[in-house]
Amino acid sequence: MEPESIEDYYERIAAHVGADGRLPVAVEEMPGWDIFPYEVDSLRLKPLQPPAATEPARRGEDAAACWCANPVDPDSDSLMWWNERWKVDLGFEGSGLPIMAWLSPLVHCDLGTMPPAVAAELGSLVGTMAGAIEGLPSVGRAQLAKYGDGGAHLHLLLMGRPARMLQLRGSPLLDWEENLPRVPSEVLASNGRPVARALAEAHGGWIGPAAQR
């Protein structure tokens, strides 16, 4: 049996929509969990749309036009840590979580096209960051996300899930995050500092302005 085409996948899903073109809300799954941020009674999915003709272009598809074509700016306000091969940026433009940090290689690649040397370092870097994030007093767990639908250059998001706020667990965390009050920039900087120090101790490099405020 050959792998399923997107047309067949869509047709199989579309066979389950109602007269209004919507799939039913799966209340027995995550929408029924206590950590789901929305009340289910008034919740409905948007009508299902057919596949687009092509995948949309992403930022940085052309390596020459990607941000990595330029050297790291050591004066960037969002830069938390960097070395010769990687950088970490702190989410200063509005975070509802104790910390949201973006890990990216400086060589142009995505997850499926990483050179072996980059892939070999990735796990160690993620482990260092996760350990430092989970050491913050306001954090109960580090969460890791990779999407890549907007940008072609690999970027992993590490988030600090707030400690003991049990509604904010699991995959709905980002839905909660967008509705939480913004954390003050000085608090984000103080939370980023021990993470940057841990990276510098384990992987060398330099601590950026975002962790020196």
Where are each of the predicted segments found?
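C-terminal helix-cap and adjacent tail motif
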Residues: 47, 162-213
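A short glycine-rich, hydrophobically flanked beta-strand micro-motif that places a catalytic Asp/Glu
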Residues: 137-150
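Active-site helix/loop of acyl-thioester processing domains in fatty-acid/polyketide metabolism
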Residues: 120-136
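Short histidine-centered catalytic/ligand-binding loop motif
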Residues: 101-125, 176-184
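Secondary-structure boundary elements
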Residues: 131-138, 201, 205
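Histidine-centered divalent-metal-coordination microenvironment in nucleic-acid enzymes
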Residues: 105, 147-175
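Active-site microenvironments that recognize anionic phosphate/pyrophosphate groups
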Residues: 1-98, 206-213
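Glycine- and small hydrophobic-enriched segments that form the cores of compact globular domains
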Residues: 75-89, 110-117, 121-125, 149, ...
